[in-house]
């Protein structure tokens, strides 16, 4: 028998902001594995951001070790892997729609509306991005034209249903494109701002990947005319002290 590490095996039994976030993150950058001759049933969560893995490990009250290694999927970059052996957690995640080799066929889970923003934030931190579209003016000055938010998945069905759920939050039907080995759900500037409000409103500063939040923040500093009261409050609540 291997070493039995401590972990909160009831974590996925009940919806909460942290549970929804971690579930979203696992849908993006996690996997369920059933290897009877090695570890039995276990989950694996991978990220190039060590803080994200440490945060999830802390929420799960896990004593499992984080493994540092190079990954072919991240272009040879260093990534951090958390493996948790637990039949209970595996089975709870299975009930929530996850299963082994999920990447090409997974569907969007039934997330209570109250926790949709937290789930989307977790997925965004795992497999989403935000970027500027830039150009240069007549005087060679840098012009920020717009921002784009992208969610990536190997499953088109997952992104189609994510788009449907996001429409209940006032977003338009996002455009889905195929890019190399995966599908991408893309949103323009106006919907990107709505996504910002949805995923960051009412959150604490230690509950997300700060680098992605800061890209939004940089955009709002460059385009103060789009900053309304809700955005101003979110930015004020997430000042690093």
Question: Where are these predicted regions, by residue range?
Answer:
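Internal intein/HINT superfamily modules and their associated LAGLIDADG
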Residues: 1-241
């Amino acid at each position: 028998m291997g070493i039995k590490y401590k972990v909160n095996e009831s974590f996925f039994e009940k919806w909460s902001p942290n549970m929804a976030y971690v579930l979203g993150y696992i849908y993006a950058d996690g996997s369920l594995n059933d290897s009877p001759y090695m570890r039995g049933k276990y989950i694996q969560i991978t990220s190039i951001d060590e803080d994200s893995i440490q945060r999830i490990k802390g929420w799960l009250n896990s004593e499992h070790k984080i493994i540092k290694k190079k990954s072919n999927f991240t272009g040879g970059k260093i990534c951090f892997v958390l493996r948790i052996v637990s039949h209970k957690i595996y089975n709870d995640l299975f009930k929530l729609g996850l299963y082994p080799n999920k990447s090409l066929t997974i569907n969007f889970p039934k997330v209570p509306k109250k926790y949709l923003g937290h789930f989307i934030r977790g997925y965004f931190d795992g497999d989403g991005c935000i970027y500027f579209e830039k150009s240069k003016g007549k005087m060679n000055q840098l012009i920020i034209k717009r921002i784009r938010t992208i969610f990536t998945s190997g499953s088109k069905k997952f992104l189609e249903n994510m788009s449907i759920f996001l429409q209940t939050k006032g977003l338009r039907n996002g455009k889905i494109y195929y890019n190399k080995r995966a599908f991408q759900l893309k949103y323009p500037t106006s919907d990107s701002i709505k996504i910002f409000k949805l995923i960051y409103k009412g959150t604490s500063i230690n509950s997300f990947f700060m680098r992605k939040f800061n890209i939004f923040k940089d955009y709002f500093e460059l385009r103060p005319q789009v900053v309304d009261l809700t955005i101003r409050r979110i930015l004020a609540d997430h000042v690093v002290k």
